[in-house]
A protein has these predicted regions:
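N-terminal glycine/serine-rich phosphate-binding loop of ATP-dependent small-molecule kinases
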Residues: 1-91, 144, 211, 215-223, ...
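Active-site core segments that coordinate phosphate-bearing ligands/cofactors
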Residues: 5-6, 107-119, 132-146, 150, ...
Length: 410
């Protein structure tokens, strides 16, 4: 296959990329800033806006050249509940704190870290917690649901009518999947459809959508994958030199210790284990580096140019906003003319601490916005004893998808 549309649904921004997978080159790119819609029944994702963006991009790209396929990748911790006709409830924003109201209840039900590799996380960051809260608050709507679909697979279903699940998403801090038992755990209520490989064709574009948007009937739509997990593929396939680290950045910084197929001993903050797109165990570490950076800079807080020992980033449990403090509780004072550089170095230090917590080794392959952040990359290079290799986002994403198809067909 050659000319494929990659739909990349990040938490903050979405991208549509027309790519030639043979040459691994991008041909055209569209971008959109995502919105969370406030109000009833709870903060939720702008599904209609994203649908217009996706279908508009497909129509625009089809006018450039014939398309041979579509693949959707998406951010984690997001699930859509559907019946035959569409959503039975809006798609909950995982930063919404509502599920915390039932935290004690849910904690008695959720599987242990040793079973799922999922640490307990706030708000809706564990999909199991989302489902528990939704089932309690909206029992009638949940009773109507036919499928629970992970975020990329919701769009695959919307484009094709075919319901599938994908392993890298199912095992990503959701409290959903028994790593040893290789099965969905009971807390989910049996709504998830069967697994299919990320590269497989789930179905073809619905005839009504093709006709409405001037697209060819029969356009293949692939199963799709979790965005961070896709970043592993070029560095974990046949002939790869291991161990290595795949670091995907954006709203979240996610780092995978490739070649270290050992469960972390305990759920330290940000530490977890999941399965990669091909079902192999990968310890990983993540924190909201992009959100923390945006929150702290937007708040115009006092930032040191050279963070002192003990200076750290903390998240307000009530608002979810990040701030910079030190462990003594003292106010952090300005320390130079470039406070953002100091913050970037601190974020890099936190990333390195996470890598050590999951016993990572080898070169770091950095993708996403932080790959172009010189201060962040310089701090990684200073603190990590192996090479650090940043790569531009669109180019790396095309390479990831091309590598996925190469591996899947091998």
């Amino acid at each position: 296959m050659a000319d494929v549309v990659i739909i990349d649904l990040g938490k903050t921004n979405s991208r549509a990329i027309l790519a030639d997978l043979t040459t691994r080159q991008e041909i055209a790119v569209r971008r959109m800033e995502n919105r969370v819609l406030p109000g009833l029944p709870y903060p939720h994702l702008d599904v209609d806006g994203q649908a217009a963006f996706i279908l508009g991009a497909l129509a625009e790209f089809a006018a450039i050249m014939p398309l041979s396929g579509v693949m959707v990748i998406g951010h984690g911790a997001t699930v859509a509940l559907v019946d035959h006709d569409g959503l039975v409830l809006p798609v909950l924003d995982y930063e919404f704190s509502g599920p915390d109201a039932l935290a004690a209840d849910y904690d008695r039900l959720r599987p242990d870290f040793a079973v799922t590799g999922s640490p307990r996380m706030p708000g809706g960051l564990n999909i199991g917690a989302q489902l528990h809260w939704l089932r309690d608050r909206f029992p009638d709507q949940i009773a109507r649901a036919r499928h629970a679909l992970f975020w990329p697979q919701y769009w695959t279903w919307r484009l094709t009518g075919q319901a599938v699940s994908e392993i890298s998403y199912a095992t990503s801090h959701g409290d959903l999947w028994s790593l040893a038992g290789a099965e969905i755990v009971q807390v989910t209520g049996g709504l998830f459809p069967p697994l299919a490989p990320a590269h497989a064709v789930a179905g073809v574009l619905r005839a009504d959508l093709a006709a409405a948007h001037g697209l060819l009937a029969g356009l293949p739509v692939h199963v799709g994958a979790h965005d961070s997990s896709l970043a592993l593929v070029p560095h974990a396939g046949r002939g790869a030199r291991l161990p290595a680290v795949a670091m995907s950045t954006g709203t979240w910084l996610t780092a995978f210790a490739i070649g270290v197929e050992v469960m972390p001993p305990d759920p330290a903050p940000g530490v977890m284990a999941s399965l990669d797109i091909f079902g192999r165990l990968v310890p990983n570490f993540r924190f909201m580096a992009g959100k923390a950076r945006a929150d702290i800079l937007a708040a115009r807080l006092d930032l040191p140019a050279h963070p002192a020992e003990g200076c750290r980033i903390a998240q307000d449990p009530k608002t979810g906003a990040f701030r910079l403090i030190d462990d003594t509780g003292a106010e952090v004072r300005p320390g130079g003319n470039d406070p953002a550089a100091g913050l970037d170095r601190l974020l890099a230090q936190q990333a390195i601490a996470g890598l050590r917590a999951i016993a990572a080794q080898g070169p770091i392959h950095v993708t996403g916005p932080f790959a172009g952040n010189r201060d962040f990359i310089a701090a990684l290079q200073q603190g990590w004893p192996f090479p650090v290799r940043p790569r531009s986002y669109e180019a790396s994403l095309v390479d990831q998808v091309a590598s996925l198809f190469d591996e899947g067909q091998g």
